[in-house]
């Protein structure tokens, strides 16, 4: 009897782990964390992983290949990869999320924007874009007409 009682906690643990795997969903943070882990070694594999979360992207293989090639060409000009940091996370309801990161390189940063959608119970990457215009956006944001003290409410 005591042997049986000792095995109950282990059985309960395995049962609960099974439930979290079955009912748990991948979060957008888990997707981007894995994306950047892959990205540090192979940017093309990271993009493939991101879009693998969306079954509909199989129909856009040419566009994904083009995206990977253009990003590689840009990366080749930017120097060594130095890491990343999240800039913002915006939501529209409970099923749409846009997450923006700065990807740091020796020469200049690149902005990555992930657009996630959850049609049912699982987040998927619906769109991914990148650009190097973060400096222009910051410059625009600091223009006098955008400053709080110059806004007439």
Language model segments and positions:
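Bacterial N-terminal signal peptides that target proteins for export
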Residues: 1-9
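A solvent-exposed, acidic/Ser-Thr-rich amphipathic alpha-helical stretch
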Residues: 62-67
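A short, surface-exposed beta-strand/turn
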Residues: 113-124, 130
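Low-complexity, intrinsically disordered terminal/linker segments enriched in charged
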Residues: 129-153
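Surface-exposed, charged secondary-structure patches
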Residues: 68-113
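Short, low-complexity N-terminal intrinsically disordered segments enriched in polar/charged residues
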Residues: 19-37
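Bacterial N-terminal signal peptides
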Residues: 9-18
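Short, well-ordered alpha-helical segments enriched in acidic and aromatic residues
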Residues: 41-57
